[in-house]
C-alpha cells in the first residue's frame, strides 16, 4: 500500500523517508520490509542489483533501489541526494552494510582492517555527515550497527570488532553533538539468521548449537520481526527522547550493565 494511502491508519512511520544501506538482503532487507509496513518510504542502497530490483518490485512505490558503492566517499552525498529527490525529504539513516574477513589477531592484515573500516566505519561516518542537514530539518534519526564481536571481543573477529566499536564510539559523539539539532542517534547490536549465517551453519555442522549456547532464548532473531521491529521503534517518534544507546537485540546473549 502506498504511503499516501496509509494516512489515518495506525502506522508509526507515515511520511518518513529512510535510507537503508545493505538493504537488499539480510538484516537490511528485514528492516526495509518492516519500515514499509509502517508507512515509510525507503531508499535501498546495495550492490546486489538482482536482490535490490526484486525487493523494490515486491514492495512497490514506497521503495527505490540505488546501486552504489558505499566505500567511495563521494557517493555519500549522491545517496542522500537520491533519497531526497525520490521522496522529498529524509528522516532516517540506517547504516547497516558492512563486509569483513575473519582471522586470528596475529594473522589479521592491514588489508583486512581496511576492508572492514572502508565498508563499515567510514561509510557510516560519511553518510552521517551528508545526511545531517536533512535530518536536522525533520528531527530525524540515525540507526547504526554494532556487534557482540566488538562488545565481547570475539576471537577471529579483530577487524570487524574494531570497526564496530568505532561505530559505537562515533554514534555516542554524534548523540551528544546532534541532540541540539533534534537528531537522535542509536545503535542496534543484533543476532539474526541471515543468508550469511545460514551458509556458515551449513558449512560447519554442529556450529549452530555452539553459537546459540550462550543465548538464553536459544534461537536466532528474525531480520524483520525481531531486528526490523526494533529499528521501527528507533525510527519512530516513540524513541524521540532516546539517544546514544546500544540496543542488544540478541536473545539475551550479551546483557550490558
Language-model features: locations:
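Short C-terminal tail/terminal secondary-structure segment
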Residues: 2-12, 152, 243-257
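C-terminal substrate-recognition "lid" of short-chain dehydrogenase/reductases
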Residues: 87, 125-128, 134, 220-249, ...
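Short, small/polar-rich loop/turn modules that mediate ligand/substrate recognition or access, typified
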Residues: 94, 179, 184, 242-244
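Substrate-binding pocket helix/loop in short-chain dehydrogenase/reductase
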Residues: 104-105, 109-117, 211
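Active-site helix of classical SDR
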Residues: 128, 163, 171
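Alpha-helical segment proximal to the catalytic Tyr-Lys
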Residues: 133, 176-180, 240
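Residue(s) in the substrate-gating loop at a strand-loop-helix junction
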Residues: 147
Amino acid at each position: 500500500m502506498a504511503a499516501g494511502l496509509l494516512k489515518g491508519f495506525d502506522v508509526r512511520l507515515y511520511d518518513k523517508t529512510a535510507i537503508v544501506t545493505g538493504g537488499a538482503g539480510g538484516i537490511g532487507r528485514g528492516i526495509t520490509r518492516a519500515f514499509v509496513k509502517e508507512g515509510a518510504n525507503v531508499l535501498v542502497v546495495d550492490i546486489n542489483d538482482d536482490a535490490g530490483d526484486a525487493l523494490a518490485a515486491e514492495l512497490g512505490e514506497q521503495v527505490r533501489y540505488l546501486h552504489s558503492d558505499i566505500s567511495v566517499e563521494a557517493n555519500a552525498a549522491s545517496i542522500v541526494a537520491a533519497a531526497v529527490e525520490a521522496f522529498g525529504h529524509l528522516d532516517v539513516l540506517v547504516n547497516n552494510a558492512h563486509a569483513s574477513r575473519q582471522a586470528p589477531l596475529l594473522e589479521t592484515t592491514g588489508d583486512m582492517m581496511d576492508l572492514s573500516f572502508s565498508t563499515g566505519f567510514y561509510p557510516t561516518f560519511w553518510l552521517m555527515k551528508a545526511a545531517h542537514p536533512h535530518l536536522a530539518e525533520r528531527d530525524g534519526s540515525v540507526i547504526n550497527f554494532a556487534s557482540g564481536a566488538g562488545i565481547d571481543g570475539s576471537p577471529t573477529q579483530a577487524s570487524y570488532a574494531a570497526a564496530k566499536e568505532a561505530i559505537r564510539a562515533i554514534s555516542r559523539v554524534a548523540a551528544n553533538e546532534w541532540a541540539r539539532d533534534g537528531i537522535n542517534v542509536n545503535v542496534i547490536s543484533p543476532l539474526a539468521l541471515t543468508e550469511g549465517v545460514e551458509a556458515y551453519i551449513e558449512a560447519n555442522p554442529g556450529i549452530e548449537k555452539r553459537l546459540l549456547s550462550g543465548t538464553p532464548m536459544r534461537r536466532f532473531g528474525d531480520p524483520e520481526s525481531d531486528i526490523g521491529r526494533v529499528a521501527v521503534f528507533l525510527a519512530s517518534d516513540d524513541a524521540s527522547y532516546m539517544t546514544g544507546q546500544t540496543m542488544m537485540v540478541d536473545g539475551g546473549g550479551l546483557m550490558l550493565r
